[in-house]
Structure formats: C-alpha cells, structure tokens
Amino acid sequence: MGTLTYLQYTNRVLEDINETTLSALSSSRGIQTVVKNSVNRAINDIANSEVEWPFLHSDKDQDTYAGVAEYSLPSDHSYVDFDSFMLFPKNLVTNGTFDSNITSWTDGSSGTGEIGFNSTGPQPPASRTGALRLTAGSSGTAIAYQALTTTKNKQYRVSFGATYPSGGDLTLNLGTSANGTQISTNTITIDDIGDFEYVNYTFTATGTTTYISFSQSVDTQVDIDNVVVSEDFHPHKLKYISYDEFQDVLKERDRGTNVSRLAIPECVYRTQDEKFGLSPVPDMSTYTISYEYWKTTTVLSSDSDTSDIPARYEHAVIAKARYYAAVLRSDTATAQASLTEFDDHMKKMRIELVNKKDYFRAV
C-alpha cells in the first residue's frame, strides 16, 4: 500500500510541470484536471503491465453448499491461479484466531475467573495478532465456550495452541451444553513455557450442536490461539480441467439427477460467466475452497485515497502522469524524459517483484 494520497500525487506532478497546486481535488481546473485524471491512468498502466504483481495478490476462501456446483469469482479479480485451488474441511469455529477481539466466545467463568483479549506481552509474541486469555484468579474458574453446528455421528478434529507464563494445565471439554463433558474432557499439560504448545483431538458429534469449552482453575493465566474444529479428513489439491473437458467428460454426470453426482470435489474448472465449477458436485456444505487471485487496482477518487502501488515505487506513477500531461501540452522533451524515467522504474519493479529464481524439479 502506498503512502501518497490522491491529492499529493496530483500536486507532485503539478509542481514538476510548474503549475499551481491544489488544496482540494474538487476545485481542479484545466491542466489540474488533466493531471488528476492522469494519476489514475498511470496507476492503471502499472497494474496492467504485469499479471502477477505481488501488491495486487489476494487469497479467497469459498464455502461450498451441498448440491451447488458453481460459485462466483471475486468481483475485483483480474487473474485467477487455477493451479492454487485447495479443498479444506470448513472451520466451524467463529473467530478462532482472535486477531482483534474475542467476539463469539462466551464467558462462563465463576468466582474470580474471567476471560479477555490479550494483544501484548510475551504471550502472544510480536508475530501474533492476539490471543484468548483465561485468568482464574485466587478463587475461581475461567471458562470460555462456543456452540458449534455439527452433524450427528460425524467425526471431527479440534486443534489449538496454548501457553502458560509459568506452566500448568488447561481443560478442553466437548459436550452438548456449555462446559459440558458429555462427549469428552481432556487435560492439557503445558510444559513449553513461553511458547505455544499445539495439540489436537478427535471426537464424534452426538447431535447438531456441540459446545467447545476451555476452562482453567489454577491461579495463573493461559493464552489460547488458532482454534480450529473441522471434519476429520485430509485437505487435497483440486485438479484443473478445461471447460471443454468438463463439457465432454463430466457434464452429463454432474448435471444429472442421480445422487451419485454428489461427492467430495476432485476437479475445478472455469465457466464462461466469471465463475468456477467443482466436480463432482459437493455433497456437503462443510468444505472450504481456498485459492489465490490477483485483483484489479482501486481507482482513486477522494483527496485522501491511497493507491495499491508500494511507497518505494510511487515515483513511477508521478513520472507516467507527468508524461501524459506533457504530451497534452506538446512538450516533447519533458514527455520523452518522463517516459524514460517511467520505463526505468518499471524495470526495477520487475526485477524486484516479478523475476523469479530458476527452479528445476525432477519428474
């Protein structure tokens, strides 16, 4: 993300061509308006010059729905990497990473026990954005729980990381009620003081609602992060097939009415209308499809808008916008110098951001 605002970009170019700067873009006139429009034009030129600029990269997670084969691609996509499609079991936990709060977790503590959000201190370290903290106090029990939607008799896997400042035990309860143990109760002894210890368990759901609960009754604190509950099956990569291959080989089966068309998806294809399709058609609504794509750049409109172009390459935008202004004014010398400067910046950007080290793989 860049640091220069739309107004600052415009004024930098106006200064370069010795024109009056603006206090607000809404008051632009004549050459000022030309420069203002040229800034967006220059940003688009940069964005469109390469398919896979790192600063335009995005990740997308799409939950599946049983019986639904096709899903819309992001509205802002310019290129989708169909070799990156992976199928994962859907995480049933809401806010299991505690990036900025502990929303969706209920405090069932008693006595001096309490739960809270921890964003400072050695737990979590600087590389973490946040964690759920349980504090029992001198005479209480800290309890945090969440109700999950499950399928009866399905097997699930729960995993999470936990740490104590001074060591201790944490209890994980799985049941049909808050802090209930109807399914299982598990005691986690944490020995890696100062670091997160990761554990995982499997369980079989006994109904459509399962409660995951963490409790701690020792007079100290415990931090919990990255809580995941999902169906117990291994993620796998989806094979890309062309739309023609889907039409020739798989469409007759997938568009039929026989339930045999429903299964765990193995293939992905691109449709003719900005969607992707899965084959076989998903048999459950508990899968997540994860993939990578590159987005279109954002058009600047208000004075304070910033661009997607990284700060160290913002001079490329200024040079290309100056080029467009010089062409309009028939200033050939300035236009040529600005275009040369822009090309030099683009070479640097490609070397630093796009060029990749050669890699050879045995086949």
Description of each model-found segment:
Residues L172-L174, N200-V227:
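Extracellular beta-strand ligand-recognition surfaces/modules
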Residues S100-L132:
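Extracellular glycan-recognition surfaces and repeat-rich motifs
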Residues N179-T208:
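Extracellular carbohydrate recognition and processing domains
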Residues S127, S139, T151-N153, P165, ...:
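Surface-exposed coil/turn segments at beta-strand junctions on protein surfaces, enriched
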Residues D169-G180:
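Short, surface-exposed beta-strand/strand-loop-strand elements in extracellular ectodomains
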Residues F98, L132, T141-L170, V199-F203, ...:
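Extra-cytoplasmic beta-strand recognition segments
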Residues M1-G96, T103-T106, N186-D195, N226-V363:
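Glycine-enriched, solvent-exposed interface loops adjoining structured elements
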Residues S138, K152, T163-T171, V218-Q221, ...:
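Extended, low-complexity, turn-rich repeat/linker tracts enriched in Gly/Pro/Ser/Thr and Asp/Glu
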